[in-house]
């Protein structure tokens, strides 16, 4: 199944604002970058349940349309301001395998876990400018006072024991002030 062009993610953040480009393309831990720029960093869990994937996640996660997977969504907060909306998805059967601890993370950072395990491999980043019709745009903006016209996001797979988790990070307007 091919993803339709409007749903496509791109290998480079072409046309991304200059002040976001560095954030988007940094391959290290986004959690660590934000922590280094904040007095108080916090992970705020907002959703975690078995749910269906977004349509543009199906192919990359090798999921059928109605298959349920574990979806985890959090805000990364800097001094209580949300700066990133993070969305991760892992196949249900992998919760008994490589990703068995994921469902118990609570307000702990997934990024810390991903970047401290040397066995985890990461695929290249993919980028997209999310518009209001994209489901992740809607969820990312749920607690924002002012909705922007669009939001930039990046995603990649983290693979442990041949089992992937897809992590998407949506950059909220406040990230530009860090």
Curated annotation (Swiss-Prot):
Pathway: Cofactor biosynthesis; ubiquinone biosynthesis. Coiled coil: none annotated. Its EC number is 4.1.3.40. Substrate binds at residues 72, 110, 169. Removes the pyruvyl group from chorismate, with concomitant aromatization of the ring, to provide 4-hydroxybenzoate (4HB) for the ubiquinone pathway. GO terms for molecular function: chorismate lyase activity. It is found in: Cytoplasm. It is an enzyme of class 4 (lyase). Keywords: Cytoplasm, Lyase, Pyruvate, Ubiquinone biosynthesis. The gene is ubiC. It comes from Nitrosomonas europaea (strain ATCC 19718 / CIP 103999 / KCTC 2705 / NBRC 14298). Belongs to the UbiC family. It catalyses: chorismate = 4-hydroxybenzoate + pyruvate. GO terms for biological process: pyruvate biosynthetic process; ubiquinone biosynthetic process. Pfam families: Chor_lyase. One of its GO terms (cellular component) is cytosol. This is Probable chorismate pyruvate-lyase.
